[in-house]
Amino acid sequence: MATERRVARVAELIKREVSQLLMYEIRDERVGAGMVSVTDVEVSGDLQHAKIFVSIYSTEEVRRSTMAGLKAASGFVRRELGQRIRLRRTPEVVFIEDRSLERGSRVLALLNQIGQQQSTSEVLES
């Protein structure tokens, strides 16, 4: 079992390497169709499994297509990680769509809308 510090370092290294792979190495058109960014990586304590959370800025149809492309490219990503990172065993890679940024921007838009409505009602009351 790896220490928490080592797990965090490996997760950060995987995040950086997968980001590079997404930008320059993966040739699948489905992956390039939407703007894809790696938001987080969770690595198991034994360094055998890596959950890679990705944020995709595009339509729902393109998101599904991009996730299918990432799933198809997971073997390539694992092989490249094995060549770039020195680990006894290369972790299994799973891509998971992260919609937290989308939800956060929607909440901010709603808060801005509420703020505008309050300022408008204050002006009307004056």
From Swiss-Prot:
It is found in: Cytoplasm. One of its GO terms (biological process) is maturation of SSU-rRNA. InterPro entries: KH_dom-like_a/b (IPR015946), RbfA (IPR000238), RbfA_dom_sf (IPR023799), Ribosome-bd_factorA_CS (IPR020053). Its main location: cytoplasm. The keyword Cytoplasm applies. The keyword Nucleotide-binding does not apply. Keywords: Cytoplasm, Ribosome biogenesis. GO terms for cellular component: cytosol. Pfam families: RBFA. One of its GO terms (molecular function) is ribosomal small subunit binding. It comes from the Bacteria. PROSITE patterns: RBFA. One of several proteins that assist in the late maturation steps of the functional core of the 30S ribosomal subunit. Associates with free 30S ribosomal subunits (but not with 30S subunits that are part of 70S ribosomes or polysomes). Required for efficient processing of 16S rRNA. May interact with the 5'-terminal helix region of 16S rRNA. Belongs to the RbfA family. Monomer. Binds 30S ribosomal subunits, but not 50S ribosomal subunits or 70S ribosomes. This is Ribosome-binding factor A. It comes from Thermosynechococcus vestitus (strain NIES-2133 / IAM M-273 / BP-1).
